[in-house]
Amino acid sequence: MPTDSKMAKFLQSYGYDLILGSVAAIYVVMAPYTKVEESFNVQSMHDILYHRHHLDSYDHLEFPGVVPRTFIGAFIVSVFASPVVSIISCLGFPKVYSLVAARLVLGCIILSTLRFFRIQIKKKFGNQVETFFVLFTSLQFHFLFYCTRPLPNILALGLVNLAYGNWLKGNFYPALSFLIFATVIFRCDTMLLLGPIGLELLLTKSISFWKALKYCVGTALLAVGLTIFVDSIMWKKFVWPEFEVFWFNSILNRSSDWGTHSIHWYFTSALPRSLLVAYPLSLLGTLVDRRVPFFIVPVLSFVILYSKLPHKELRFIISSVPMFNLSAAVAASRIYNNRKKTIWKLVNMVMLAFFAISAGCTVVTFMASYYNYPSGYALKRLHQIGHPANVAGEEWVHIDTFGAMNGISRFCEDDFPWRYSKEEEIVVEELRNRNFTYLVNEHSSVDGYKCLFYEEGFERLELRRGFPPIVLVKKAKVYLHREMKKEDPFHKKWPGC
């Protein structure tokens, strides 16, 4: 029937996108809150959506952070999310629904760019490699979870995916242009990827030096002009945010203040956790197809160069994951095609076993991540049961630094009678002298306040004998206190601490 034919064509074109999008959407709905790494873009999206042109009400003017960040990514996401947010506001739903909408929009943007890359994989390597690429991506928790997190690295990832797609397509100059935009506007460290790719293209005579120079300089000037124009307005001063980030992290080497890892950490911890079964297969992919090293070597060089920086996080190299997945998909396709041969049959069985292990690791990792936002759950619980609807007075909630870093953003705030303070550097002994009704903090006891309940957070994974072999260990992370002078009009029985 015609309808069935249309549905079949739709699924053939967008089926893989629906799979990846559904997995990413589940992660967002189940764990909608955000952490300190995302705070700037999250607060910026909130302010663009709710305060619009009233810049004086924007969060970044009160809490500017260590270095300025660009508003361009927040603007793009907010423009696409605004119709949904308007409906949410009209229906009177909590603002956290708007956060979910914004994160879903970001996920759609990133997965749309991944779709472009995937289509080029299909054209260059075939349908089967494309299928394995989707399978690997869907089994990797970190990539699909991160693609909805409003981090500068993820905003840059969208442009990197477009660069990868053009690279595979043979459009080398546009590929370099996308990488330059990502470097200048979102993440200056993308230059560590731009350099190896550009050098390889020059050495293989895939591009002309002078033509590439014209492209790169023109694109860089356009990107610099755009970010300075937009961000100077938003920050109310002349600023190129990503240059200041580069100066702070690379020249002053201040990023080490947030901790350091060994030089091999990306290869012995970050990549194995993020790639799972694709990690060993990505190495095999470079051996079974002569086309793969052309794409893998620059990306591998990117990770090696990044390893020189002391401060390391998985999100810094998240843009390498799609290309490693391509190499792994090529290897998996070769193994599958030769599965009837004796040796390859054994390799195929091992690969299938690792697929199952990867799925299990993804479930465990998601469960751990679910409990990484105790402050968000604590504030939600307070809103649900902490205040009667007929009381006219304001209810002040103080959120300490730990609380603000682990789940709470302005999207988590409710309207009157709730008021919020994130005032920093208040010693615990001074809190009783302030006009705070409730406290959300990391202290189990505060003078002048009664602890109503606590929220547990992820502590560690523990191996045990028996079933299940892996146990999620949780620990009390965030406590909610109420001023002792404040009477509970409903006489609720709080669980206490």
From Swiss-Prot:
The lineage of its organism: Eukaryota, Viridiplantae, Streptophyta, Embryophyta, Tracheophyta. It comes from Arabidopsis thaliana. Its EC number is 2.4.1.260. One of its GO terms (molecular function) is dolichyl-P-Man:Man(7)GlcNAc(2)-PP-dolichol alpha-1,6-mannosyltransferase. Glycans are attached at residues 253, 435. Mannosyltransferase that operates in the biosynthetic pathway of dolichol-linked oligosaccharides, the glycan precursors employed in protein asparagine (N)-glycosylation. The assembly of dolichol-linked oligosaccharides begins on the cytosolic side of the endoplasmic reticulum membrane and finishes in its lumen. The sequential addition of sugars to dolichol pyrophosphate produces dolichol-linked oligosaccharides containing fourteen sugars, including two GlcNAcs, nine mannoses and three glucoses. Belongs to the glycosyltransferase 22 family. Keywords: Endoplasmic reticulum, Glycoprotein, Glycosyltransferase, Membrane, Transferase, Transmembrane, Transmembrane helix. It catalyses: an alpha-D-Man-(1->2)-alpha-D-Man-(1->2)-alpha-D-Man-(1->3)-[alpha-D-Man-(1->2)-alpha-D-Man-(1->3)-alpha-D-Man-(1->6)]-beta-D-Man-(1->4)-beta-D-GlcNAc-(1->4)-alpha-D-GlcNAc-diphospho-di-trans,poly-cis-dolichol + a di-trans,poly-cis-dolichyl beta-D-mannosyl phosphate = an alpha-D-Man-(1->2)-alpha-D-Man-(1->2)-alpha-D-Man-(1->3)-[alpha-D-Man-(1->2)-alpha-D-Man-(1->3)-[alpha-D-Man-(1->6)]-alpha-D-Man-(1->6)]-beta-D-Man-(1->4)-beta-D-GlcNAc-(1->4)-alpha-D-GlcNAc-diphospho-di-trans,poly-cis-dolichol + a di-trans,poly-cis-dolichyl phosphate + H(+). GO terms for biological process: protein N-linked glycosylation. Pathway: Protein modification; protein glycosylation. It is an enzyme of class 2 (transferase). In the absence of ALG12 activity, the N-glycans transferred to proteins are aberrant, indicating that the oligosaccharyltransferase (OST) complex is substrate-tolerant. Pfam families: Glyco_transf_22. This is Dol-P-Man:Man(7)GlcNAc(2)-PP-Dol alpha-1,6-mannosyltransferase. GO terms for cellular component: endoplasmic reticulum membrane. The chain crosses the membrane at residues 10-30, 71-91, 92-112, 125-145, 154-174, 178-198, 215-235, 263-285, 292-312, 316-336, 346-366. It comes from the Eukaryota. Coiled coil: none annotated. It is found in: Endoplasmic reticulum membrane.
